[in-house]
């Protein structure tokens, strides 16, 4: 873990691999705190999820959480815009906005087009959500959820498309 953290650069976020809901997450600001927080996260992961596997990612101090909703099938992928999920409490989303109030039109077009291209390249079919951390004008890929998320009605209201039906 120490070598990974040095490579990524502090601060880092230790997360439960099987986690969710902010459980099993620890922010490590400096190396001398790593061992204790790593063990604590491991115990919490086992307790909450029955799996003590962890992963480490860069921690962003003032991030925006941007999600791109996609639908893909029959050799065609389309985006249904983005959602800004940055208003959170304990790593749980409270408010979803679409379109994101912090992106310029150029940034929006860029991330939407790059997301469609990525989904096409991996050959994914179905509804999905590609998540990014956005900070200081840069996007960092977080994950892709290959299912319809609870937030999908925000996109449905904005686009008029019934994602589940489609």
Annotate the PLM regions.
Residues 3-7:
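Gly/Ser/Thr-enriched, mixed-charge loops and adjacent short helices
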Residues 8, 16, 21, 28-166:
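ATP-dependent carboxylate activation and anion-phosphoryl transfer catalytic cores
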Residues 13:
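N-terminal cofactor/phosphate-binding cores enriched in small/glycine residues
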